[in-house]
UniProtKB/Swiss-Prot annotation:
GO terms for molecular function: large ribosomal subunit rRNA binding; structural constituent of ribosome. Part of the ribosomal stalk of the 50S ribosomal subunit. Interacts with L10 and the large rRNA to form the base of the stalk. L10 forms an elongated spine to which L12 dimers bind in a sequential fashion forming a multimeric L10(L12)X complex. Keywords: Methylation, Ribonucleoprotein, Ribosomal protein, RNA-binding, rRNA-binding. This is Large ribosomal subunit protein uL11. One or more lysine residues are methylated. The gene is rplK.
Length: 193
């Protein structure tokens, strides 16, 4: 029989350093028991922040699921910066290489909604962009792909416009011939009368 869930909470602690406190008090979990279990499970992860989902059941037992460190943490670590840019559009806070991007994407893959490394790289690259971190080699590829997409759209629009003009030209030619025929017939009628 499945246990009745009382509460589900998502929190984040430093690996191996969770302590009883206000963030856990609101969850309703046995704090010493949870912190011991969490710290034992994350001790080997250094000082990285570890997101955790805690499910507390009505009988006061609990389960928890650990996630990978946030992509922003890994990006800051790779770029050797303390924080991202306050204005990512105008200020570059740092850079990472394409290899570092791939490593972070592969690390984050279990927590992302994709199984494809390239899609994961795009997700992590988006996070890096929001932080003002440039990905050497990737941003150039992304710009080239975007330019190709825009060029294809422009070519498609030009082709559609050309076809539209051609069909309009044919309609005009066809209608002009009819108008002339009508005019000739009407003039012949007027002359007969």
């Amino acid at each position: 029989m499945a246990k009745d869930v009382q509460k589900v909470a998502k929190l984040q602690f430093l690996a191996g350093k969770a302590k009883p406190g206000p963030s856990l008090a609101g969850v309703g979990v046995n704090m010493p028991e949870f912190t011991k279990a969490f710290n034992d499970a994350t001790r080997d992860r250094g000082d990285e922040p570890v997101p955790v989902q805690i499910t507390v059941f009505k009988d006061k037992t609990f389960e928890f699921k650990l996630f990978t460190a946030p992509a922003s943490y890994k990006i800051k670590q790779a770029a050797k910066i303390q924080s991202g840019s306050k204005n990512a559009k105008t200020t570059i806070a740092g850079t990472i290489t394409l290899e570092q991007l791939k490593e972070i994407a592969e690390y984050k893959l279990p927590d992302l909604n994709t199984d494809d490394v390239n899609a994961a790289m795009a997700i992590v690259a988006g996070t890096a962009k929001q932080m003002g971190v440039l990905v050497e080699g990737y941003d150039d590829v992304a710009k080239a792909k975007q330019a190709a997409i825009e060029a294809a759209k422009a070519e498609s629009l030009a082709k559609a416009k050309k076809e539209s003009l051609k069909s309009q030209e044919e309609e005009l030619k066809a209608s002009k011939g009819k108008a002339i025929d009508v005019n000739v017939i009407e003039k012949e009628r007027e002359e007969k009368e």
